[in-house]
């Protein structure tokens, strides 16, 4: 006679109930005839031991979002980064919450992340930070907005835009003001302007850059030099192209350390998840996991 026993009609019946089984510090003997396919049970049990579940506190996410919103001018827009699928916290769930809180933009690292969000029903505009040229067609198809940071990328996108006869498709121009990672430099502006001027296939929705030392108050001179260069280069583009796009350069630490440089929009990233480089600011943030 067996105690604490659960039985199943067959292997398929076991799998129907598998998610309800809870094993903790157990030794499991799997034995049976080959035709029962018990090797599938072994595989499932092995995978189950490696599962990790991270519970996300959406109230904490909302709290942190509102904390950073409180630092902004009433006219400043907010883009929230959900790249890497919400830093591992569940991209769609976070995106729906942000949509509820009426943020203005979402940012993702790669096109497939944005496509997943669009397919799940997210209607917020989504900027793709690192689009590969091979993803441009998918970006257009799913109404994502690419960040363009090189003449090669711009020309590749324009070629597709012309073939598809697009009208004023939104793109985002990234300037390199000191990060030296991606972006148009001052010496590129003449060719950039010549390429964009009068082009009807695309529209510059925003001009952006990325601060290299916004979290290091000992590097304020470098940070201010970046801000000065961003102001200069973006003003040239706006004047020459006769446009008034959204401008943004501040990330999470920049929101706190350089409030005078909010421009039209800021980009909130890791701060949404309760992480700050400032110990004093950290006291006001809530842990989300």
Identify the residue ranges that each predicted region occupies.
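Short hydrophobic/aromatic-enriched beta-strand-loop microsegments
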Residues: 2-9, 49-51, 123-132, 145-149, ...
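N-terminal active-site wall of soluble small-molecule enzyme domains
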Residues: 70, 74-144, 148-157
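Hydrophobic residues within beta-strands of alpha/beta enzymes
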Residues: 28, 106-107, 126, 247, ...
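Short, polar loop motifs at secondary-structure junctions
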Residues: 1, 34-35, 111-113, 131-134, ...
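Glycine-rich tight-turn/loop motif centered on a GG-T
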Residues: 46-57, 96, 141-146, 219
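ATP-dependent carboxylate-amine ligase
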Residues: 1-63, 70, 111
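C-terminal helical cap(s) of enzyme catalytic domains, especially alpha/beta-barrels
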Residues: 38-54, 115-121, 278-289
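Active-site loop/helix belt of alpha/beta enzymes
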Residues: 53, 60-64, 70-71, 84-97, ...
